[in-house]
């Protein structure tokens, strides 16, 4: 069974995935979609910072992440939107975030 902290982190990653889906699939602006989510969820400051880093980081590194994922996925554009965002989030955490253990990023992406 997961402990309370792991459940909170997983919730933040889930929120990041939803915000990114709004950005990439629906054409929402990242800052607007993120602000709405932060306002609705009333997260603790640490979780707000983590969510913000995930969303802006994936958006900023988008082409690089798609290239990296594309080395393992035949055509990322044909991948289901939720799966595509999970892969981007996982790759971003593994390759761009120093403080997130690769095992944690991989575990939550799967």
Question: What function would you assign to each model-found segment?
Answer:
Residues 1-110:
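Class I Rossmann-like S-adenosyl-L-methionine
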